[in-house]
């Protein structure tokens, strides 16, 4: 789905309980088109390949991209906001189709390949497989060096939901790709390994200072998954401060 010029959103259905039961869990994926040299694209959080209810998430993503005239082999960079499988599992498959490098923060990669691997071994006993993280590039706080890129992106360290969670800010479009930092009326979970209530509050306050016209969240929690308009976004931050922060 095209939002504005060169910005596409692929929202995973799952607003109502019936939809969540039917479609299962997966993240929203976003694409910045024609943003790299030779007209290549950046995809943020490609999601899963197949989820817990056997929905073929990656196939669905590729079909929706094709409807917008976007070919998966024209992807030039894959960015993970964080290393939870519902956000990154499809990354290696897309890399195989496009030869695009995978980028994640170093803190997130190190956490998931140490503590995360211990957790993964425990989950494997229940038949749950957590793919390993293999990064080609590490994201650091500050402007992302994309060479001869058309889009200037800024990486923001936003820990709290996970230790190395990042958000991506596109100043030209005033768009924030927030991953699982903040949703419509809620925040990312902090009651999981690597989560921190203190850090997620600090991270939300950090991004709330930006000029944002498009808040692009990782899930449709609270609906909609995209909050548009500076005043609507400000109201959402205010709501989260008043009604969610005290209970984290």
Show the residue positions of the predicted features.
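Conserved beta-strand hairpin/beta-sheet module of binuclear metal-dependent hydrolase folds
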Residues: 2-68, 167-181
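Short Pro/Gly-enriched beta-strand edge/turn motifs at strand-loop
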Residues: 7-16, 123-126, 148-151
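Hydrophobic/aromatic beta-strand patches that form the interior of the parallel beta-sheet core
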Residues: 8-10, 79, 103, 137-139, ...
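Short Gly/Pro-enriched turn/cap motifs at secondary-structure boundaries
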Residues: 19-22, 133-136, 157-159
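Short polar/acidic secondary-structure junctions
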Residues: 22, 35-36, 144, 158-160
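Glycine-rich phosphate-binding loop signature in dinucleotide/nucleotide-binding domains
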Residues: 36, 68-73, 146-151, 170-171, ...
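Metallo-beta-lactamase
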Residues: 41, 48-51, 55, 118, ...
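Active-site HxH/HxHxD metal-binding segment of metal-dependent hydrolases
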Residues: 48-144, 232-243
